[in-house]
Amino acid sequence: MINKTLLQKRFNRAAVSYDQYANVQKKMARHLLSQLEKRYSKAAAIRILELGCGTGYITEKLVHLFPNAQITAIDFAESMIAVAKQRRHVDEVTFRCEDIEKLILDDFYDVIISNATFQWLNDLQVSLVKLYKHLAGEGILLFSTFGNRTFQELHRAFERAKEEKNIKSHVSIGQRLFTKAQLQNICSIKKGNVHVSETCYIEKFTHVRDFFKSIRKVGATNSNEDTYCQSPSLFRAMLRIYERDFTKEGEIIATYHALFAHIEKEGKRRNETNTNKSRLEENCV
C-alpha cells in the first residue's frame, strides 16, 4: 500500500526541482501528446481531464495543442499545482487539488490523460472503472505508468547484496509494478477498446548516488508501507554491487520501463467534425 500522506509530502517538496530531473517523465509525456495530435485537430472543442498534472508540463502543451479545449487539471500536491499555475497561457485551466482515488466527477470528458502517475494508486482497476464511466462517447483514457522492469539494475544489485549478507527475510527496495500483461488485464473494461504498449528508456549517471538523487528530486522515493530496506550496511553493499555490475563506459545505467495504455469508449462522438480521421496508432513505441 502506498502511504499517500508521505507521498504527498515528498511531491510537495520536489515541486521546485521536478522539471530539472524528470527526463523520462517528459519523454513519456511527449509520446502521449503525439497520440492526441493524431486523433484531434487543433480546432477541436474537446473537454480534457488531466490527472496528476504535477508542475503542468503536459497542461501547458495541451493548451497550445488544443486552444479551444476545456481543460481541468488535478494533482494532490499543492506545491505542484502552484508551479503549474505559473506556466504560460494556463489562466483558463481549472486546477483542482485532490487525490485521484477520492475524486468525485460530475462531468463527461472526451479525453482523460495521465502521465507517470497511476503507479501511485492503491487500486488502479477501481479508478479505471470510475474514470471510464466519465468518458464521453468515443472518448479516450490515455495514460502512462511505470512497469515491472523499472530500475531492474537496482533490484538485481539489492538481491545480490542480500545474498552477500546472507539475509533471508523478505525485504524489498521500491514498490511492485505491473507487467504489460497485467496492465492489459486490468484495463480490459467491458465494451472498451484497449491497447497497451511498452518501451524502455535507459538513463545514465556518473554515480549511483546521482541516480538516487534524480529519484528524490522528482519525489519518487519509496512511499510503500510494506517492509523495505532499512539496513545501512545492506544499502552500502547494494551501492557497491550496483556500480560494480551495472557500469558501462564509465557510467551506471538505470532502466525505466514505460507502459502506455489507450482505452476508447464506444458511442457517438460529440463533435465529429473537429477530429482527425486518423486514429491512435496501435504500435509499440
From Swiss-Prot:
Report the domain of life of the source organism. Answer: Bacteria
Might you name a Gene Ontology BP term for this protein? methylation
- Explain the purpose of this protein: Converts the free carboxyl group of a malonyl-thioester to its methyl ester by transfer of a methyl group from S-adenosyl-L-methionine (SAM). It allows to synthesize pimeloyl-ACP via the fatty acid synthetic pathway.
Q: Which Pfam families match?
A: Methyltransf_31 (PF13847)
The UniProt record lists the EC number as: 2.1.1.197
Query: Which residue ranges does UniProt annotate as crossing the membrane?
Result: none
Q: Which InterPro entries match?
A: BioC, Methyltranfer_dom, SAM-dependent_MTases_sf
Q: Which SUPFAM superfamilies match?
A: S-adenosyl-L-methionine-dependent methyltransferases
| Molecular functions per Gene Ontology | carboxyl-O-methyltransferase activity; malonyl-CoA methyltransferase activity
Which family is this protein grouped under? Answer: Belongs to the methyltransferase superfamily.
- Alphabetically list the UniProt keywords: Biotin biosynthesis, Methyltransferase, S-adenosyl-L-methionine, Transferase
Q: In which pathway does it act?
A: Cofactor biosynthesis; biotin biosynthesis
Q: Does the keyword Cytoplasm apply?
A: no
What does the record give as the reaction this protein catalyses?
Answer: malonyl-[ACP] + S-adenosyl-L-methionine = malonyl-[ACP] methyl ester + S-adenosyl-L-homocysteine
> What name does UniProt use for this protein?
Malonyl-[acyl-carrier protein] O-methyltransferase
